[in-house]
């Protein structure tokens, strides 16, 4: 949001993508800034060695926290809604990843459509983000639409079943948007924990 507010084009990348795919994306879109964390430092350094265009690198966990408060500027609509706001790269299953350029108009139309036609988002509901935000579906349905109506988003520390359950306990989550494979992974994780104990296995059998 900070990037978009300042007129930047945002390119979310899957941190689990292969080094080759990340290198391809960076060489293709040629970003000026790359935000990551120290956890990915080894991969980033290996990728940077083969880049023709090297962006400025920012490790988010090394940025000094500024606790000072300042007035938040009200959101201003972009002067050119046709301007590219986000570039989403495909998974590259049929070749190299391809960048899909989405304008501000695309995003606004998507969010307004989802908010109006899928009447599940309200100000008092919390939405748990489960899917990665480098895909359009979770970007619009799990992040942008809830915030658009004044709702709350919740992010789990990881996809581990224990973290998910802990997140659900601590927050009043009303909506979880996912895909069948994701729910299957959650089910298998929970079932493995149930099967590991004779007591729980007896109770849930």
Identify the residue ranges that each predicted region occupies.
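Conserved G/P- and acidic residue-centered "switch" motifs that form tight phosphate/ATP-binding loops
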Residues: 7, 92-93, 150
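Conserved AMP-binding A3 loop
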Residues: 85-111
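Structural core segment of the AMP-binding/adenylate-forming
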Residues: 5-67
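Conserved S/T- and glycine-rich ATP-binding loop of Class I adenylate-forming
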Residues: 3, 34, 84, 90-93, ...
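Conserved AMP-binding/adenylation subdomain of ANL enzymes
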Residues: 108-126, 133-205
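Short hydrophobic alpha-helices that are characteristic scaffold elements of the AMP-binding
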Residues: 1-6, 28, 147-148, 187
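Conserved pre-ATP/AMP-binding loop-to-beta segment of ANL
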Residues: 70-89, 96, 120-126
């Amino acid at each position: 949001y900070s990037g978009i507010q300042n007129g930047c084009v945002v390119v979310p990348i899957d941190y689990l993508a292969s080094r080759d795919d990340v290198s391809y994306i960076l060489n293709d879109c040629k970003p000026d800034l790359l935000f990551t964390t120290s956890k990915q430092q080894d991969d980033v350094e290996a990728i940077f060695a083969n880049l023709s265009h090297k962006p400025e690198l920012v490790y988010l966990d090394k940025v000094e926290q500024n606790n000072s408060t300042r007035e938040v500027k009200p959101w201003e609509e972009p002067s050119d809604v046709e301007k590219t706001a986000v570039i989403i790269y495909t998974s590259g299953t049929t070749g190299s990843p391809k960048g899909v350029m989405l304008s501000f108009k695309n995003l606004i139309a998507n969010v307004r459509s989802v908010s109006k036609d899928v009447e599940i988002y309200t100000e008092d509901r919390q939405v748990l983000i489960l899917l990665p935000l480098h895909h359009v579906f979770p970007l619009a349905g799990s992040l942008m639409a809830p915030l658009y109506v004044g709702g709350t988003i919740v992010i789990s520390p990881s996809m581990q079943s224990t973290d998910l359950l802990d997140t659900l306990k601590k927050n009043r989550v009303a909506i979880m948007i996912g895909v069948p494979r994701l729910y299957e992974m959650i089910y298998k994780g929970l079932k493995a924990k149930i099967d590991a104990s004779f007591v729980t296995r007896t109770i849930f059998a």
